[in-house]
Amino acid sequence: KDAGIQPMADVVLNHKAAADGLEEFEVVEVDPMDRNKVLTEPFTIQGWTKFTFDGRNGAYNDFHWHWYHFTGTDYDASRNKNGIYQIQGDNKGWAHGDLVDKENGNYDYLMYADIDFKHPEVVENLDQWAEWFIETTGVEGFRLDAVKHIDSFFMKNFIHNITKKYGEDFYVFGEFWNGDTETNDEYLESIDYLYDLIDVALHQNLFRASQEGENFDLRTIFDGTLALNHPEEAVTFVDNHDTQRGQALESTIEEWFKPAAYALILLREAGLPCVFFGDYYGIEGKFAQESFQEVLDRLLWVRKDLAYGEETDYFDDPNCIGWTRSGSEESAPIACLISNNQAATKVMEIGSSYAGLTYYDVLENCSETVQVQEDGTAEFPVAERSVSVWVAQDTEGQ
């Protein structure tokens, strides 16, 4: 905080693992591909659902978790058998189908012991935990993991209580891993737009663009995205821990396109961009990836100091798109250009008041300079399968 950084916590509310003991309870086994399809009559299993936290010795509270605080689990210790087991009992069952993702019929269950957000003791305990956690750690925001698996009615009330107590500046966004436009619209409505969502559709578009190269129409890069449809609620990203190579949702943006992808999230008005640790510092091991620190530092500098003002798009060619930002009282306009095919140029307007001003590519992908003409336009180049970010030559700070 002393450095001007707002600390946030990555909060996993969906499930609990590493229980302290086994319990017996009644379940039915369901089809993994359709969790609404029951495969068995009710029977008894032994599951890891007893959480007593003996090592804490009651230091924080005396709440213990038991089988009736969960909706399901994935392992029967008595038979040494894996499966998806829906816990039976009063007011049990998955969350209502309209409150969770509809993949696999009902995607309430993800893994381990799945928390039952309908249970009043669970709701009370999590509200108390949130207050304790925020005041103990001093965090000023939450990243909510796996929200498409969590009852959205609970999430709306949970976050409402937090922001009511700690203010609207307590920033919250959710990992809602679904790229469908209508589904995102419905989810945002269901939570009353109380928190933002990661822009999965944009990531998927960036991935396709990197895979398809010149066959991808760059004019469609924002189609169906939160950045386009809900710019104030979009958390934009290029890659993350789930999409990197070797992970469950592997869809890594090809290296040749990553600088362009980051320009698209860092230098535009829409969305709150997030830079992936692995892209900045690189990744080692079996699925190694180079570091993009140098190009990211330059893009981040442009974002921080120069990427202000009205945005004008030049999305007029399937293989070459550009945009300008009109600048501020302290900074001249900037221009960005992306090509997924051959080298190209595009005439874009900077403003007649900047006539004679010389521009250079801060990414150094183009070595020449460009001068703004008397009419306020300039013809900016971009190299083959590349990105260029053009800034005024007398700009300080880089």
Where are these regions (language model features)?
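Solvent-exposed, charged interface segments at domain starts and junctions
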Residues: 88-111, 252-260, 386-388
